[in-house]
Design a protein with these regions (language model features):
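C-terminal, surface-exposed recognition/capping segments
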Residues: 17-36, 41-42, 49, 58-71, ...
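Long, hydrophobic, well-ordered secondary-structure blocks that form the structural core
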Residues: 1-23
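A short, polar/charged loop-to-alpha-helix boundary motif
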Residues: 72-82
Length: 203
């Protein structure tokens, strides 16, 4: 959606650098007062939070872990079934292809034939002013994916920043996660509540 709206890959120049030149994490809520929910908070660019469509800090501040993606060296494994999410394994996962074998600014994205919805950096020969000006980290062994960038990511940070060189046991203070509320649970709760009150009305 961002690509359609802004017709460009450089989220830092289009919306804001995000909190990417600090020394520790900031509290959430820095963009709550914004009237339009895309942009950056008042202050020095790089030292304030950004928001995109009501999502605060999609880049900058802290990395976000991504469930359902495992790397074994350059091989990308993906899974869409939360019941099968697991670290450091390909069991229950689909081989989605091969990512960039070295770290650097992204110069190309690969599209998987086995999981057509999955894209990942396939080449890292760009710069902060060319191609996709966000960074991609890679390494050997079993690794997880964290995205967005952290408080001192600088020009590395952005909506397309792929940090794929963290072990699954990494628990540094610059890595967080986005909580997910499954809609089918909401439907179940709503249905149960409706049934409960309809029975009371019938009584």
């Amino acid at each position: 959606l961002y690509i359609v709206e802004y017709a460009g890959w450089d989220t830092q120049s289009k919306i804001g650098k995000g909190y990417s030149s600090g020394s520790s994490a900031i509290s959430s809520g820095g963009t709550d007062v914004m009237t339009y929910h895309t942009g950056r908070a008042y202050g020095t660019d790089g030292a304030t939070a950004v928001q995109y469509r009501h999502i605060e800090n999609p880049w900058g501040n802290v990395f976000d872990w991504v469930d359902g993606v495992n790397f074994n060296g350059s091989t990308v494994y993906v899974c869409t079934d939360p019941a099968k999410y697991a670290d450091d394994t390909s069991d229950g996962y689909t081989n989605a292809g091969t990512r960039a074998s070295s770290s650097g600014y992204i110069s190309a994205l690969g599209a998987s034939t086995t999981a057509p919805w999955a894209i990942y950096p396939s080449s890292a020969g760009g710069s902060e002013t060319t191609y996709i000006p966000d960074y991609s980290w890679t390494s050997s062994g079993w690794l997880g994916l964290a995205v967005g960038g952290d408080w001192d990511g600088g020009s590395f940070a952005g909506l397309f920043y792929f940090n794929g060189n963290n072990s699954s046991s990494n628990s540094n203070s610059n890595i967080g996660a986005r909580h997910l509320f499954l809609l089918h649970i909401l439907r179940r709760v709503s249905h149960t509540t409706w049934w409960k009150f309809s029975q009371q009305d019938a009584a």
